[in-house]
UniProtKB/Swiss-Prot annotation:
Designated name of the protein: Mannitol 2-dehydrogenase
Family to which this protein belongs: Belongs to the mannitol dehydrogenase family.
Free-text function comment from the UniProt entry: Catalyzes the NAD(H)-dependent interconversion of D-fructose and D-mannitol in the mannitol metabolic pathway.
Species this chain originates from: Aspergillus clavatus (strain ATCC 1007 / CBS 513.65 / DSM 816 / NCTC 3887 / NRRL 1 / QM 1276 / 107)
InterPro entries in the record: 6-PGluconate_DH-like_C_sf, 6PGD_dom2, Mannitol_DH, Mannitol_DH/Oxidoreductase, Mannitol_DH_C, Mannitol_DH_N, NAD(P)-bd_dom_sf
Keywords, sorted A to Z: NAD, Oxidoreductase
């Protein structure tokens, strides 16, 4: 039987053909529901995480006023627009593990707006009273957050453009759109919508608040004051490994489940979301569908710290050295005995001792779960995805552990090796001399500094919006990173790794 094109009309046939291996939405969509969530940045992670939770709300709890309107701000988002439009905004989540795979058609995205076509439509949608939450997955670089000063990058050309009142109705950045919509709601006497970051950053809600308030103060102090007093920016920890979708994944979906989907999502069974209970205009009952809703922001921060430093820090330890060594996938790296020992020892000896205890959480169990997830061969998690946009990741995932270790005189050699591997990775040449693509919003500056510095990290460490003065001037850190860079450059990753394994 030929695969069925994914659309609303074919859902019942897709369900019947897939038997127990395929789930489809049975709730009402389109005009029968309100779009209470506007989501900026509809990529793989959003479709495997927040959109799945909202699908559960609609399917299991009968929620009808929190469907999602997706928004794409960038020209490349036209690909997502076209993919969703061709199948009534439906898509398939393929969940894979060693136990097998199953497919879940998600219907929580009810519509999609492409900002380059109509920026006013996006502003009007966010200003609509039905919109209670505007959620974000815009990656670290989308926040224009200076890691060194902890302030908005007001000098950035896109921020400068959006701060000009002449451009209020044609913004480029997320903050330009948020401000324009909130200013309109302020004039209309409406409550501000909750701005809910779903990005993988520590204190994501607090950073979002600070950046938006800083932006708003430049435009209208009264609106900024209203946002500060009435707005809500919950902090959250999000987790689900979501590799890039390949042509092979689409073919497997058609052959194994009978679904023709132009852009499915592949992911793992594990999914977690811890969010602060801070909303300005209501929220759905997230806690009823597996979300950990907590009153205390401190609890969120502790979960965030565990996840960012253990999971994402380990991903960095797998990604940059792994790509330099010529590997392609996360599970391939972890199958190598040197890497598996290195990652485990870094977690146990250098990261874990610096982490706070969380009641009810066993850190060793969490570490074992991470190893199990990293070694899952079925999701084929690509190293280039792990390595993407490192300038927004390394300062969060690796450098804070190094800084704390220096402060308390704890071991940090393996963490320095990871930092050194990234510095070498920036040049885009692996240990066999093969070139690979480096994708980073700061690529030109990073590569210029990397070439100028050679095996000396000082040039890269001089980038002040990435690295603080505490690391830049610490002789122990400089010594460890320089030595690791020299060894990696001379001998390669696999010959250098044994020096970092007990």
């Amino acid at each position: 039987m030929a695969p069925l094109k994914l659309n609303s009309r074919n859902l019942s046939q897709i369900f019947a053909a897939g038997k127990s291996l395929v789930k489809v939405p049975t709730y009402q969509r389109n005009g029968a529901v309100k779009e209470g969530i506007v989501h900026i940045g509809v990529g793989g992670f959003h479709r495997a995480h927040l959109a799945v939770y909202v699908d559960r709300l609609m399917q299991e709890q009968g929620v009808t006023d929190y469907a999602i309107c997706g928004v794409g701000l960038q020209p490349f988002d036209s690909t997502m627009r076209d993919a969703l439009a061709s199948q009534d905004n439906l898509y398939t989540v393929i969940e894979r593990s060693a136990k097998g795979s199953f497919a879940h058609v998600i219907g929580s995205i009810n519509s999609y707006l492409f900002a380059p076509d109509d920026r006013e439509a996006v502003i009007a949608k966010m200003a609509n009273p039905d919109t209670r939450i505007v959620s974000l997955t815009i990656t670290e670089s989308g926040y224009y957050y200076n890691e060194n000063t902890h302030e908005l990058q007001k000098e950035h050309p896109d921020i400068q453009f959006d701060l000009n009142p002449v451009n209020e109705n044609k913004p480029r950045t997320t903050f330009g759109f948020l401000y324009a919509a909130l200013e309109r709601r302020h004039r209309l006497g409406l409550k501000p919508f909750t701005v809910m970051s779903c990005d993988n950053m520590q204190k994501n809600g607090s950073i979002t608040r600070h950046m938006l308030e800083s932006f708003a103060r430049q435009r209208n102090p009264k609106v900024a004051e209203w946002i500060a007093e009435e707005g809500a920016f919950p902090n959250a920890m999000v987790d689900r490994i979501t590799p890039q979708t390949s042509a092979t994944d689409k073919t497997a979906l058609a052959e194994n489940f009978g679904i023709e989907d132009s852009w499915p999502v592949v992911t793992e069974p594990f999914m977690q979301w811890v969010i602060e209970d801070k909303f300005s205009d209501g929220r759905p009952p997230f806690e009823k569908i597996g979300v950990q809703v907590v009153k205390d922001v401190h609890a969120v921060e502790q979960f965030e710290k565990h996840k960012l430093r253990l999971l994402n820090g380990s991903h960095s330890a797998i990604g940059y050295p792994g790509q330099l060594a010529g590997f392609n996938y996360v599970h391939e790296v972890m199958e190598h005995p040197l890497f598996s020992k290195f990652v485990w020892q870094m977690m146990q000896q250098e990261v874990k001792p610096l982490l706070p205890e969380i009641p009810g959480v066993n850190i060793d169990d969490y570490c074992n779960t991470l190893i199990e997830r990293f070694t899952n061969p079925t999701i084929m998690d690509q190293l280039p995805r792990i390595c993407l946009n490192a300038s927004g990741k390394i300062p969060q995932f690796i450098m804070p552990s190094i800084a704390e270790a220096i402060w308390v005189t704890a071991p940090f050699r393996r963490l320095c090796f990871v930092a050194a591997a990234w510095f070498c990775y920036i040049k885009g040449i692996d240990d066999s001399g093969k070139a690979f693509e480096v994708v980073d919003p700061m690529l030109n500056e990073l590569q210029a500094k990397a070439r100028a510095g050679g095996t000396n990290p000082s040039e890269l460490l001089s980038i002040k919006n990435l690295f603080g003065d505490d690391l830049r001037t610490d002789p122990r850190f400089l010594k460890e990173v320089t030595k690791a860079m020299e060894d990696i450059t001379r001998d390669g990753i696999l010959k250098t790794l044994p020096k970092y394994i007990d």
